[in-house]
Amino acid sequence: MQRSLSHIIRLNKTLLLLTKIENGQFPENSTIDLRAVVQEQTDLYNEIYASRNLSCYVNISGEFTVKMNESLASTLINNLLKNAFIHSEAGSKIIISMQDQTLTISNDGTKQLDATQIFNRFYQGEKKEGSTGLGLALVKAVCRYYHLNLEYRFNKDRHYFSVTWP
């Protein structure tokens, strides 16, 4: 009962956030150091998923600052990282790279996802317990809000999610 209630509350909060993004209710932008956001959230996920023995490599060359709402920048990075950590098998590798205004997060995988569906609300290629199916929809909403290019590709048993700033 408690788990179901918690899931419904999280689902409701996420849907409200999606609606706020789509309605343009995040006008305050500031200069965000994405390197710091990525490093902070990567450290957090490494701690949370330490028991799964995932190898996470961060390759950030140079400065990477953008003009965004701080909350939305965090939402974007958080959901991309969470997706990689949740959908990686124990002992596998996650690679995060930032260069030339592009952030790419990749993780091991065995089969390509449906690129026409993965960013849609409630789509779940492989159902994971506790998942709302809204994480990548949030990523898509933030990218659309800021006119960022969002791309998914699968190559040599790896999933690649890339966001490029103009």
Give the ranges of each region predicted by the language model.
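Short conserved segment of the HATPase_c
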Residues: 111-124
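Short alpha-helical segment of the dimerization/phosphotransfer core of two-component systems
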Residues: 3-8
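Short beta-strand/loop element within the Bergerat-fold HATPase_c
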Residues: 91-102
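Conserved catalytic submotifs in the C-terminal HATPase_c
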Residues: 55-65, 99
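Glycine-rich ATP-binding loops of the HATPase_c
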Residues: 147-155
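Conserved micro-motifs of the catalytic ATP-binding
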Residues: 23-28, 65-68
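Short helix-loop "hinge" at the ATP-lid/N-box region of the Bergerat-fold HATPase_c
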Residues: 84-85
